[in-house]
Amino acid sequence: MNLHQTVMKLNFLAILFMLLPFASVAQEDQSTLTKVGDDVPQFAFEIEKGKQVNISDYKGKLILINLFATWCPPCNTELPLVQKQIWEKYGSNGGFAFFVFGREEGWDKLIPYKEKKGFTFPILPDADRGIFKKFATQSIPRNIIVDENGKIIYQSIGYTEKEFAGMVALIDAHMQKKQVQGK
């Protein structure tokens, strides 16, 4: 192989590595079925055993939806932080609602999981992925924030400290704005 061929191969590899992140983003976009600015998909869910509600029942509140599974390591990193940094701050605020849905898991797994972890926020079943399928085709954890008008204002896939800090900052800013407006 001559010098020219070697340089051409190195240039090709450099371009390939530069384009690799875009392939990853495209895959994420394909797995996400909703977009920021969309109306939240309508769905009913069991808020407690035997009691059905609809997501539209919570219109007028800032809603955080978390899609997770008990076996998911990033989910198990994120949820204790949600407990401390979001739920303990806003859980008793009437203008805030938070729902964690266990993908492919029922009450039989979720109740003991919640008790073992010491979580005080609602962890609810999504045994058939019916709720998950409204938002995505794959990948957890996912967080979706819905504003008081039922519009999606934030979505994330996976867990990173930076992404989580940004989500907390958005919730803080939104809740402070509501407090100033007296809502």
Pin down the residues of each PLM region.
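Bacterial Sec-dependent N-terminal signal peptides
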Residues: 1-29
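N-terminal "domain-start" segment that seeds a small globular fold
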Residues: 27-55
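Short loop/turn microsegments at loop-to-beta-strand junctions
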Residues: 40-41, 63, 140-142
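Short active-site neighborhood of thiol/selenol oxidoreductases, capturing the structured segment around
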Residues: 54-76
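Loop/turn elements at helix/coil->beta-strand transitions in domains of secreted/extracellular proteins
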Residues: 60-62, 94-97, 121, 148
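Structural microenvironment flanking redox-active thiols in thiol-disulfide oxidoreductases
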Residues: 76-117, 130-133
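Thiol/disulfide oxidoreductase modules built on the thioredoxin-like
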Residues: 113-119, 126-172
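Non-globular targeting/processing and membrane-anchoring segments
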Residues: 177-183
